[in-house]
Amino acid sequence: MIPAGHRPSTPAVAAALGTVYVVWGSTYLAIAYVVESLPPLLAAGIRFLVAGLALIAFLVARDRWRRRRGIRVEGLQWPRAVEWRTALIVGALLLLGGNGMVMIAEQTIPSGIAAVIIATTPIWLSVFDALLTRRMPSPLAIGGLLVGLMGVGILLLPSSGLDAFDPVGIGILVVATVCWASGSLYARHGPLPRSHLLGTGMEQLAGGLVLLAVGVSIGEVGRFDPAAVTTASLLGLAFLIVFGSLVAFTAYVWLLNHVAVTTVATYAYVNPVVAVALGVAFRGETLTPRSLLAAALIIGAVVAMVSGRPREAGETGPSPDVATLEPEGDVQ
């Protein structure tokens, strides 16, 4: 429970939720602009490397500031090797397997459709958790999985014209959801620093390095033409770093410490709605009856699962930059 004396004002909660809804919902639109002229994995690697370094630098600077002023809080502890290993594995799963695959898929898939498919991650998370704990998934989880898969299946049906979606791109996005769910589960049980912000900074730093290494190894550097880079791509990348990885993430952490985790979890199904609306408004993405039906099935399944069952600490679905965080306590 959150102490009554620590309950924030309604405007503060609304502002933080609005930031998470709008910024994380708009990251899919930003990605669509980034991959127009920047290599997807290298761009993602730069994003998370810069964000991770910035977050760790902030934590170190804040720790020194507190020490100089004699503020009595637990100091920042340098991570152990086993914690860096966890950060590397989680970073690879979430940021290479998750975000990196989204970057690749959005070269052929509309940003709104990408967001809708990624919204199925909580469904996979629930199913994988049930398998690991050897507990039978609830009827709600099974129903949500079937309805969500039905929505994805509708997107894969053969079609033509505006109603056709690249099946390879759809498949890559499904792989991304599986990686996101796997990384979230591993982060929940693997050793990480007590400071959740430090753990996330480590994951971003490690994941960014993995993304850069893979991008170089598959020849993205050789295919990159600096002269072809557009202003829209650079602005999109800057938006992802500053707002997606830092501003919205800060609001997300604040919410986890001040409101119920079920309230924070609403972004899991609000974000795809925002992404679809922005894709239509700014990129002229077309909403056909088939894509609307698929989106309704997928988002409906996620709404039912997110709002209809107890949640473990930190389980709030896919975010662009974080695996799991505790919803209460002192997040350093």
Language model region names:
Residues 1-6, 48, 63, 157-158, ...:
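C-terminal-most transmembrane helix of multi-pass membrane proteins
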Residues 1-46, 58, 104, 162-189, ...:
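Glycine-/small-residue-enriched transmembrane alpha-helix faces in small-molecule transporters
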Residues 8-14, 37-41, 45, 79-84, ...:
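Juxtamembrane helix-entry segments on the extracytoplasmic side of multipass membrane proteins
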Residues 23, 27-28, 56-118, 154, ...:
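Specific transmembrane alpha-helical segments of multi-pass solute transporters/efflux pumps
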Residues 34, 43, 47, 105, ...:
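Hydrophobic/aromatic residues within transmembrane alpha-helices
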Residues 42-53, 94, 99-136, 141-145, ...:
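Specific alpha-helical transmembrane segments that line the substrate/conduction pathway
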Residues 44-46, 113-120, 186-209, 241, ...:
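Helix-helix packing/entry segments at the starts of transmembrane helices
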Residues 55, 120, 137-158, 169, ...:
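Hydrophobic transmembrane alpha-helices of multi-pass small-molecule transport proteins
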